[in-house]
Amino acid sequence: MRVKVTLACTECKQRNYNTTKNKKNNPDRIELQKYCRFCKKHTTHKETK
């Protein structure tokens, strides 16, 4: 089952991206390298509630 998740920048805490994930394959919180337009660089984005 795919669920909607929000990704937040670890440096400025802005919630920049919405995506979906498969809870069966990824039961833990995901971390991705994404571009943050507020920091103006690529940073780690973590899944938030």
Curated annotation (Swiss-Prot):
NCBIfam families: PRK00504.1 (NF001764), PRK00595.1 (NF001860), rpmG_bact (TIGR01023). Gene3D superfamilies: Ribosomal protein L33. One of its GO terms (biological process) is translation. This is Large ribosomal subunit protein bL33. Belongs to the bacterial ribosomal protein bL33 family. Pfam families: Ribosomal_L33. One of its GO terms (cellular component) is ribonucleoprotein complex. The lineage of its organism: Bacteria, Bacillati, Bacillota, Clostridia, Peptostreptococcales. Disulfide bonds: none annotated. GO terms for molecular function: structural constituent of ribosome. Keywords: Ribonucleoprotein, Ribosomal protein.
